[in-house]
């Protein structure tokens, strides 16, 4: 029985990995063995960081809300507590957007939170 060397299957597999490794530095975009490891590691980083991104955005929103709240004489925690007591149910993403793009609306919310405290 003759020996089978892989041929098109091997070439297709290597091309797929090297295509994914396009743009990597050094040997990582040229040599199949190195590229294969880096593509695997890159996939792990992407998987991990898709989950971490949620927390990073939440931290960014809280920092923005806190800065705007302090400009209106409240701390972040007092603002959030005041909004909850006033029955204003807004998520942090919306509050951060208001803090950056519509300072007057945020100020009105801060006043409502102060009244509720």
From Swiss-Prot:
GO molecular function: rRNA binding; structural constituent of ribosome
Pfam families registered for this protein in UniProt: Ribosomal_L20
Record's keyword annotation contains ATP-binding: no
Organism superkingdom: Bacteria
PROSITE patterns recorded: RIBOSOMAL_L20
GO annotations of cellular component type: ribonucleoprotein complex; ribosome
Assigned keywords, A-Z: Ribonucleoprotein, Ribosomal protein, RNA-binding, rRNA-binding
Matching Gene3D superfamilies: 6.10.160.10, Ribosomal protein L20 (1.10.1900.20)
Gene Ontology biological process: ribosomal large subunit assembly; translation
PANTHER family on file: 39S RIBOSOMAL PROTEIN L20
Protein function: Binds directly to 23S ribosomal RNA and is necessary for the in vitro assembly process of the 50S ribosomal subunit. It is not involved in the protein synthesizing functions of that subunit.
Family: Belongs to the bacterial ribosomal protein bL20 family.
Name this protein carries in UniProt: Large ribosomal subunit protein bL20
Biological source species: Pediococcus pentosaceus (strain ATCC 25745 / CCUG 21536 / LMG 10740 / 183-1w)
